[in-house]
Design a protein with these regions (language model features):
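Periplasmic-binding protein-like
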Residues: 149-166, 288-343
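Sec-dependent bacterial lipoprotein signal peptides
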Residues: 1-47
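Extracellular/periplasmic juxtamembrane helices and adjacent flexible linkers that interface
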Residues: 29, 51-55, 67-70, 201-209, ...
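Ligand-binding pocket segment of bilobal, Venus flytrap-like solute-binding proteins
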Residues: 118, 219-313
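Extracellular/periplasmic catalytic domains that process cell-envelope and extracellular macromolecules
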Residues: 69, 121-123, 147-149, 155-159, ...
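Extracytoplasmic ligand-binding site segments that recognize negatively charged/polar headgroups
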Residues: 161-165, 171-262
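Bacterial lipoprotein signal-peptidase II cleavage site
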Residues: 46-60
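N-terminal segment of the mature folded domain
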Residues: 59-198, 257, 261-263, 274-282
Length: 398
């Protein structure tokens, strides 16, 4: 099987320290043909991937699935690169389930970034969007025009811990906290041996080297959640607010989760924020986060403990936007605070009958049998309380 992947890493003009060194590394990477970031995977690629190995790799019992596999055969979606690895598994599982039921289906997902996904959804160019931030305000109002007679619903399909990944020779363990992270990403701390970092890492040999921050150059829900975390937990050290575009003022840009992970993997002295699954794939070192009570390493268990406290903004069936502010500020022992919920954004009404049936069928599969083995991909499967609410909302799509 051959998979064609378009790869690109975008670096903006120098916006902070270490720019020339970083760009020199990028030039060397381009000359050597290194892979720098996944931009898109075509629908035929996903279909081929599923038909080659879904039945053997997913181990799904189709008879136990509530997915009907009805409606149109091909769905299109775009958005969050953070959920790409999870979406690959959801699609593979769904194809496998429907194959066992005698149906041929496919979902083409382009990990173009959360902001782009929301834009394409509003324009009616895709059937649903993937986003690490809920659609809201003006965009939600515009979505009502697309969802004729309905509105856009944010449906959480998976939780993804955000890793603070770094490349620092000789430093296998690093502890940071929200205040120090805020100062690193706003330019207040520029050296790895800064006293504030040293105070959190007693006995560690920290080099007298510049810190190169790597940020998302595209509109990203991961960026939004990372900045919300800094805003909530840094005791006022972060004053740049939040949003899908990075507002901190310093950093070298790379496109997508794959882009920032690849950039840090090849740039000594660098640091970024990226989903755990991409940090794992690139074998990056990941910092522990000191929450005020203790330093907490990022594991599936520590992320799950934090996510267990997630709350919805509404008790109604339908939109399931989560309030993660309490998680960001947690000091519960053994709870990792830096997590995001990644959503599928759908129309509550307004689809034609074939699209509605297909969207509901795919989401039903993703919300249930699709959750199996997600931990192996660096995600946290849905807690039962979220899963129950999600299934009710999927059923309510008309």
């Amino acid at each position: 099987m051959q998979i064609s992947i378009i790869l690109r890493l975008m670096s903006p003009p120098d916006r902070g320290r270490g720019g020339s060194d970083f760009r020199r590394i990028l030039v060397n990477l381009k000359r050597s043909g290194a892979l720098l970031g996944v931009v898109a995977v075509g629908a035929m690629t996903l279909a081929a991937c599923g038909s080659d190995n879904n039945s053997s790799s997913t181990g799904v019992d189709a008879s136990a699935s509530n997915a009907t596999c009805e409606g149109k055969s091909n769905l299109s979606a775009a958005g969050s690169s953070a959920q790409k690895n999870a979406m690959d598994q959801f699609v593979a599982t769904y194809i496998s389930v429907c194959q066992e039921k005698g149906k041929t289906v496919n979902v083409a997902y382009n990990p173009s970034g959360s902001g782009d996904g929301r834009t394409q959804f509003i324009a009616g160019q895709i059937d649903f969007a993937g986003s690490d931030s809920a659609i809201k305000d003006e965009q939600a109002d515009k979505a009502k025009e697309r969802c004729v007679g309905g509105e856009a619903w944010n449906l959480p399909l998976v939780f993804g811990p955000i890793a603070v990944a770094y490349n620092l020779d000789g430093v296998d363990k690093l502890v940071l906290n929200a205040e120090v992270l805020a100062k690193i990403f706003n330019g207040g701390i520029t050296k790895w041996n800064d006293p504030a970092i040293a105070a959190l890492n007693s006995g560690a040999s920290l080099p007298d080297e510049k810190i190169t921050t790597v940020i998302r150059s595209d509109s990203s829900g991961t960026t939004d959640n990372f900045q919300k975390y800094l805003d909530a937990a840094s005791n006022g050290a972060w004053t740049s607010g939040a949003g899908s575009d990075f507002t901190g003022g310093v950093g070298e840009g790379a496109k997508g989760s794959a882009g920032v992970a690849q950039a840090v993997a090849t740039a000594p002295g660098s640091i970024t924020y990226v989903e755990k699954s991409f940090a794992d794939q690139n074998k990056l070192s990941v910092a522990e986060i000191n929450t005020g009570s203790e330093a907490v390493a990022l594991t599936n268990d520590t992320a799950a403990k934090s996510i267990a406290g997630a709350k919805f903004k509404s008790d109604a069936t339908g939109d399931l936007t989560l309030d993660l502010a309490s998680i960001f500020k947690t000091n519960e022992a053994g709870a990792y605070p830096l997590v995001l919920a990644t959503y599928s954004i759908v129309c509550s009404k307004g689809y034609d009958a074939d699209t509605s049936a297909a969207v509901k069928s795919f989401l039903t599969s993703a919300a249930n049998e699709g959750q199996a083995n997600l931990a192996e991909q660096g995600y946290v499967p849905l807690p039962s309380n979220v899963q129950d609410r999600l299934n009710a909302s999927i059923t309510a799509i008309s």
